[in-house]
Amino acid sequence: MDSINEIRTKNERLITVFGCGGDRDHAKRPEMGKIATRKSTLAIITTDNPRTENPQDIIKEIEAGVEPQNFSKYTSIPDRREAIKMAIKFAEPKDIVLVAGKGHETYQEINGVRHHFDDKETIVELYKLMSK
């Protein structure tokens, strides 16, 4: 996010979609909420491999780090596809949409089951649907 903010102009907004993995370091979650809302024009909190945890619980832990002055700079959408869709819909032509977290992974792990989910595929699919 720092690298993006160093090169973007003041007219380009940064819209960040991110989440935290389940069954992992709980202490990092509030810090990620704080940083994402500080450094983004809009942060959209979503799921990222909730594993055996309730996605809403993970999101609440992330939200706990959002500072009061940044409450208007985020929203939470548990469905990752819908979160990406919201980011694309909100974006204007010069904006930057950062979908963070999954990288090369092509699945969402939920309750021990890996469900196919690829951020890149989803972005391309949604962009095609929304530009018709």
Language-model features: where?
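ATP-dependent carboxylate-amine ligase
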Residues: 1-132
